[in-house]
Amino acid sequence: LYAHNNFDSNALVLGDVTKDIRSKFYTNISWKRSGPKNNIRKGWGNIVDSILVFKKGDPYFNVEYQPLDETYAKNSFKNKDDKGFYALGKLTGEKSRIGHMYEYNGYNPQYGWRFAEDKTKTLHEQNLIHWGANLPYKKIYLDESKGSPIQNFWDDIHFISRSEKNKRKYPTQKPLKLLERIIRTSCPPDGKVLDPFCGSGTTALACYNLGRDCTTMDISKDSIKIATEALIDAGCDINTEE
């Protein structure tokens, strides 16, 4: 469950939800929606909104990546062999998720191995394991890296400005890229999305672009009209009910 809030409503939202829902709180994504404010005089410029994330059980999660910046690459990919520079990836289990228990090459990790023994043996034969003093690690080469995993601070998706009249058709309209990232991350390809506050229909449009089913609704007739027009323009087949 993703709930978008501006900077001053987080406490109200968490205060209003029931104890059961509050216990499912997972993380707070900080979305930098704009650049610096030049008109501030007596306080901090509010350029960040929050996206509160709640989860139940162990839901689907697909890691998203962004291009490596120079500083990150320099600090992370500092090991080198004859194949090139590489970073160290996890090869063992964790306390919260015990791995495969076995001894290999003199190592017997407390929480097991991340992979089954035959997979670990294959990595060893391919010289893809960095044997550290205390733990082994999987080599991740710079030229094969997917990029830097996106964390809970998003500064690469900007809000739709008021001047972009051809793009902004609803007061609370969110950028399409924002919804597409959320859906790719938390909804499997055969999954379904529910948006109880349709607004401009951006969530439904993002689902259409990504091949997911979506059910959305709104009490505002203006919202339904705007969303319907946007979806039809995109070539989406829709079913509407009042």
Predicted segments, located by residue:
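Core catalytic lobe of class I
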Residues: 1-238
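Long, charged amphipathic helices and adjacent flexible linkers at domain junctions
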Residues: 240-242
